[in-house]
A protein has these predicted regions:
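Conserved structural position within tetratricopeptide repeats
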Residues: 1-2, 32-36, 70, 109-110, ...
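Short coil turns that delineate tetratricopeptide repeat
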Residues: 5, 39, 73, 79, ...
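TPR alpha-solenoid repeat register
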Residues: 10, 44, 77-78, 84, ...
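Canonical tetratricopeptide repeat
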Residues: 13, 47, 87, 121, ...
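Residue-level recognition of tetratricopeptide repeat
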Residues: 16, 50, 90, 124-125, ...
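Register position in tetratricopeptide repeats
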Residues: 20-21, 54, 87, 94, ...
Length: 236
């Protein structure tokens, strides 16, 4: 690249090495330089935007991903286009721009209706806001149909069913999700959700067990306080 910086294949290879090393600053640099020679290469926009998002530089991520979205053409790989727009949606939602995020997700699904990451995130964020739960349930069910051994997708689907008042169905999918997770801090929410679901199913003893597990695992004080209140009050 030092001798021939316009060699896209070599740059993409170097990019993959930096991604594997989780060196996001270098990923952003390689993409930024690559766009000087290939300003229509959507992949560079995608990875640069992703790198900025992982570096918590949301404004830069949005700027780059929006430019990339403008470069999507008929010849652009459909899965790449979908991934770029889905990532834009993730960043917009993280920046508290939910309506703009949902528009980006809708566009992402036009390019790849089976983009499970997009479907899951879109469905979950709708459920968090209590919006369009029927649409959220439909999208989430699709992720479970496509990849039914992923605990994240199973948890999302169980939670949406819970919000819809389908408690017994929610318990079935929550139990399935718990088969794939260990008691680690990053999995605390699974047990928190399980506690709520079991409480609504009338099994308060099991609910308390799951809430106590969540309390033990949650690293964030705010989440621990929320679960502690449920334990003290013995209800949601």
């Amino acid at each position: 690249l030092t001798i021939e910086p316009d060699q896209t294949k070599a740059r993409l290879l170097a990019l993959q090495i930096m991604i594997d090393k989780d060196s996001m600053e270098q990923v952003a640099r390689l993409c930024r330089e690559g766009l000087l020679y290939e300003p229509s290469e959507v992949m560079f926009y995608y990875y640069e935007g992703m790198a900025y998002f992982m570096l918590q530089r949301n404004a830069d991520a949005i700027r780059v991903l929006q430019k990339g979205a403008e470069r999507i053409a008929e010849t652009t790989d459909k899965e790449l286009a979908s991934d770029l727009l889905a990532t834009l949606g993730d960043v917009l939602y993280d920046t508290k721009l939910s309506e703009e995020a949902f528009l980006a997700y809708d566009r992402a699904l036009e390019y790849n209706a089976n983009n499970v990451v997009c479907l899951n995130n879109y469905a979950y964020y709708l459920s968090v806001l209590g919006k369009k739960l029927d649409k959220a349930e439909e999208m989430s069910k699709k992720t479970v149909d496509i990849k039914g051994d992923d605990p994240i997708y199973l948890d999302t689907y169980a939670w949406i069913l819970f919000l819809q008042g389908q408690f017994e169905q929610a318990r079935i999918y929550m139990n399935e999700a718990l088969r794939y997770v260990e008691e680690t801090p990053e999995n605390a929410m699974f047990f928190d959700h399980a506690g709520d679901i079991y409480f609504r199913c009338g099994d308060k003893a099991k609910a308390m067990t799951y809430w106590k597990t969540a309390l033990k695992l949650y690293p964030e004080k705010a989440n621990r306080q929320k679960v502690q209140r449920k334990i003290w009050r013995k209800r949601i």
